């Protein structure tokens, strides 16, 4: 992704060299994303239908969460708006007045994305509707084979002048004067020098940590899962336009449908459950037969103390790790690339640019961290030691403030460029039974019948829109079917 974006932005004015090794494996079981990736691909000039075909992808309206608030609960966290603002207040405040008195359905009934996901419907947009129609543009993301996407972008990059070298980096040479990276040495002895080095070496942090000793902030006390067991399985039935996250005894299980198979995994805390028990649970909860042996990935949730150190910028897993609960992994890669392009240095490497990059990246990681913690903390589950810990742990103060504000009267304020906006917080809080005790007092200034009609009209418009949408499978079959394997 970094090579493709830099090649598109800088053209052939800068020499870009990509060093990677096919011998270093990846956990290729399917990747779930957020809508920002559509903009990234569009900036590269990639056709959406062609992209989905090449990566054997499906479309995503959001995530279904099962058993998180209580055993038996399920709700959707989707990408689109909830209703529409009325006056100066968000829709959910009017809905909340009726909901608290038993006169409205769950919040998902007022989200086009949620209703469409439940019914297996999908479309990207409609050309014959007014701009205020929910169908004018349907925010969406993708579910795809990450390995195929990487190969697709590799070809894209090489076609635009990126020089690819197959090999492993075995040594890093630092300048004696300032400790900047001068060159990397490959297995065969070849040396590659450069001005700026981007570390995409994953958890190892080959440059940012092993060479520059940047340091790492461990967040395991808030997000205790430290392993994932992943396995692909055969496709059974229509692919859903959403990812599923099912809470388990010591973590959660993902299900990501692709056109040709399904990606599955159990993210868990090794402190509370054994690998053998995870294996039994995962393998007994697959839709179809496993297509490979499960693989275990070990990780420590957290981030580098600096994302940009000297002349090295860490991108992706080299910069930090967030479990894939809200599918933020590729987003964080994309965001890091965009930030680097905006703050691209000259050979002087101004400390002002580096400092701003690090501050913005730290803010982004910490706000996403808090949103993930919310899922574990906002629960009534106490049925296992894992959930007993999560439901009673000390949480970051800003998250605690957000929860108190929402539970008081359903309010939330987004900070600056924080990734997750009001609809996300409303859906997760309500979905996991953190219900406000009251609504905004200004709602009472609107006649109750007007509130009833507003809420009902949103529900009715969504129902009519979903009715005319094709099924997810029909949409893929018409516009972007992958070639048979």
What residue spans do the PLM features occupy?
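Conserved FAD/dinucleotide-binding core of flavoprotein oxidoreductases
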Residues: 248-300, 318-332, 343-347
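Dinucleotide-binding Rossmann-like beta1-alpha1 core, especially the glycine-rich loop
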Residues: 29-118
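Extreme N-terminal leader/targeting segments of oxidoreductases
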Residues: 4-15, 134, 147-151, 476-485
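Glycine-rich FAD pyrophosphate-binding loop
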Residues: 5-31
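Alpha-helix-centered segments that form part of catalytic cores
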Residues: 105-144
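Long, low-complexity C-terminal extensions of enzymes
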Residues: 342-485
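Conserved mid-domain beta->alpha element of the FAD-binding
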Residues: 302-367
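Predominantly flavin-linked oxidoreductase catalytic cores and closely associated redox partners
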Residues: 5, 130-282, 337
């Amino acid at each position: 992704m970094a090579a493709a974006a830099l090649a598109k932005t800088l053209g052939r004015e800068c020499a870009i060299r990509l060093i990677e090794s096919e011998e270093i494996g990846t956990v290729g079981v399917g990747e779930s994303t957020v809508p920002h990736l559509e903009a990234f691909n569009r900036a590269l000039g990639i056709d959406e239908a062609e992209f989905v075909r090449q990566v054997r992808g499906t479309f995503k309206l959001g995530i279904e969460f099962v058993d998180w608030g209580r055993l038996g609960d399920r709700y959707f966290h989707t990408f689109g708006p909830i209703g529409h603002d009325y006056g100066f207040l968000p829709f959910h405040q009017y809905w909340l007045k009726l909901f608290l008195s038993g006169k409205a359905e769950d919040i998902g009934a007022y989200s086009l994305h949620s209703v469409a996901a439940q019914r297996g419907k999908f479309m990207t947009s409609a050309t014959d509707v007014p701009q205020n129609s929910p169908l004018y543009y349907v925010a969406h993301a993708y579910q795809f084979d990450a390995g195929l996407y990487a190969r697709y972008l590799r070809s894209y990059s090489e076609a635009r002048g990126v020089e690819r070298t197959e090999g492993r980096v075995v040594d890093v040479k630092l300048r004696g004067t300032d400790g900047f990276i001068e060159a990397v040495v490959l297995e065969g002895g070849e040396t590659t020098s450069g001005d700026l080095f981007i570390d995409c070496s994953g958890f190892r942090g080959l440059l940012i940590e092993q060479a520059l000793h940047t340091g790492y902030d461990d967040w395991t006390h808030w997000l205790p899962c430290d392993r994932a067991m992943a396995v692909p399985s055969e496709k059974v039935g229509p692919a859903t336009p959403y990812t599923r996250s099912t809470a388990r005894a010591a973590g959660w299980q993902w299900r990501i449908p692709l056109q040709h198979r399904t990606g599955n995994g159990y993210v868990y805390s090794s402190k509370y459950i054994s690998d053998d028990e995870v294996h039994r649970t995962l393998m007994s909860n697959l839709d179809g037969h496993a297509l490979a042996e499960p693989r275990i990935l070990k990780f420590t949730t957290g981030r580098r103390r600096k994302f940009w150190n000297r002349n090295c910028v860490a991108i992706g897993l080299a910069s930090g790790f967030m479990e894939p609960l809200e599918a933020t992994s590729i987003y964080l890669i994309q965001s890091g690339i965009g930030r680097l392009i905006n703050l691209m240095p000259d050979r002087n490497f101004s400390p002002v640019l580096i400092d701003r990059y690090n501050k913005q990246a730290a803010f982004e990681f910490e706000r996403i961290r808090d949103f993930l913690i919310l899922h574990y903390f906002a629960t009534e589950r106490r049925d296992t030691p894992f959930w007993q810990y999560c439901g009673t742990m000390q949480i970051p103060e800003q998250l605690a403030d957000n929860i108190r504000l929402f539970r008081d009267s359903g309010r939330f304020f987004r900070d600056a460029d924080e990734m997750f906006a009001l609809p996300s917080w409303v859906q997760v809080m309500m979905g996991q039974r953190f219900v406000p005790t009251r609504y905004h007092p200004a709602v009472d200034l609107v006649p109750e019948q007007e509130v009833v009609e507003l809420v009902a009209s949103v529900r009715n418009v969504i129902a009519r829109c979903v009715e005319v949408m094709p099924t997810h499978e029909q949409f893929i079959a018409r516009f972007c079917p992958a070639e048979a394997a």
